[in-house]
């Protein structure tokens, strides 16, 4: 993807359609820049937009170069710096005809606007101090959010929750390094400005905070992109039937023929405000079929990628099979949530179910156990609740900061390494020069997240991911 020219001046006025491409009831054309009002007024028939108050709406007409009415529109006027971009902004709500949208943008360009590039409105908000870089990235996350949890985190970051925490950490680091460097300036006078015990305590607190943020990425990334759930088990255990039941759709082919699913099938659903990416895999068994063997190999790869594993057990098959399949699955289940799903309970007695539970508990002590009938839709809703609980975010503090961005995660890892080096240096009594350098490095990486310290290449890459009009 072509990167946005981050060095491009903000002197010109830009315009673009901000609503999704296509026909709709209403479309919004956004104009931003010091000549925003001037460019609109050339084609506007209505109240004098130069004289109206900021944050007001006005009904009027847009006329073409021949004076013919193009459309009736509503103009929303936002004067800088109290606007999204920090500049004068006018948003024109017109009818959603593609032709009207194209003609309106063409008129604005003829009036002196330039067509905006992808992400340019948000870039201007960043350059004009309306958003820091992590907030700007959160704008894109809000737009792309596919679940309640992902939306909640993105909105929190867009409103500055993450930024405030990072700012607080950087302020403490700045105070820390100032004391260290003050001592260096007066080293010949043997003056200690900072108690080493107190500095170690501060460094430990900062290390704990940075580590907690970095550790939250595992959950945050899953919330943002969906928790990967692998459905595994022997052929004909009901994996595809369960997937179809969860998706409320016949996505997977269901047959009494063992080995019908020979490859992985993926789809997503939202449960309890969380997105889950379900993966229906080929049945695990010994086979000489080359294609089925390839499917089984992919099954084990998907197990390694999954956060949650649903191990489907055909309750009508011999109990002895459980230990055999468990031996194949367990090596891939370390550190994951494993749920053993005993299926086809509509065909089983209470004694049968008890024996199966006992066999699972022996073969896989760490596995949670659920009993269902996917075909008869018995207790599938309870399994859905088990999935929500397995995601381990139900008890997350709604105000907690959770990292969802890989760039932020990488910066936090580097910041953590730097603060731990400083902590080791303080404990071992090495020169304050080296400790100060590590503290400044930690500050540097935290500053990269918010954009206080960054490069034009990084900024260009980030904003080029936005759609036109945002």
Describe every region a protein language model picked out.
Residues 292-316:
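Inter-motif core of Ras-like GTPase G domains
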Residues 59-71, 75-79, 259-287, 305:
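Switch I (G2) and immediately adjacent beta-strands of P-loop GTPase domains
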Residues 284, 292-296, 323:
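Short alpha-helix of the ABC ATPase nucleotide-binding domain corresponding to the H-loop/switch region
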Residues 1-152, 156, 160, 332-333, ...:
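A glycine-rich (often HGG/GG-containing) alpha/beta subdomain
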Residues 278, 312, 341:
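Generic enzyme active-site microenvironment
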